[in-house]
Amino acid sequence: MAKATDPAKQYNSNPFTLSFSALERFFKSNLVWAIIILAFGLFGFLFQATGSMADTSDKPSGSSSVSSSHDAFNNIDSGVIITVVTVAVVLMLIFIVVGGVIQTFLTGMFSYVINQSEQGRSVSLSEAFHATTKRFWRLFWANLLAQLKIFGWTLLLIIPGIVAALRYSLLPYLIMNESEKEKGVVDSHTKLKTVVKGRLWEVFGVSTVAAIIPFIGGIVGLAGRGALYRQLQYSYDHKTKRPKIHWLNYLGLVLIGLLILLIGFIISIALAVIIASR
């Protein structure tokens, strides 16, 4: 049951005010967690930037390096190649499994903290860890099933894949909001689809806010999606009327359209220059 002061009671369809209000509540209730997530974002940004610079500086030049690499490869014994490939595959599988476990724990803990922040509760590391441990396998398999659905729909048709990705971005909040006694994996997908029905544009709106804000966009999206899920769940449980979808939720479409026009304009200018130079 939601508290009298629960923000979920006041349905807010504006993705900007919803997300930043949720971020404010997050900082007020769990400042340490907010700093930790910001640190994760900074680390990821620096890692990506460093990787990009390394890729640029380490590009091989000339055909001689390609031919010498080809000759060296031909001189290697086939048994050594098989061994190296086998070890590489095993290591890759280990990294995938370990990465999946770590990602599940982080997703579960962050989602749990956001859910509790929306209720004005402070959460310790121990509480978040144990809450995630109790729901780990349900969260792990539910997320895996969601990724398979997103991948499958994207292969068939891009738009359904995007729709699935938007919907299942709220899945961790649902699982971490429910009792640890709940075990259904498919059931979590069914519940989420019912709760989010007709409001996917709001999920798109929050994702747009997160995408266009530099550096802190990740934590803004994390808080915004948590707040959106809770008000969707509250309105569904209490059968309250949801307001009209705010026009700012469509801002992402406008930005995508402008980007396409800009790319088209640049290509047109380039073609005109090429044709004129002939």
Task: Show which residues each predicted segment covers.
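Hydrophobic alpha-helical membrane segments
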Residues: 2-278
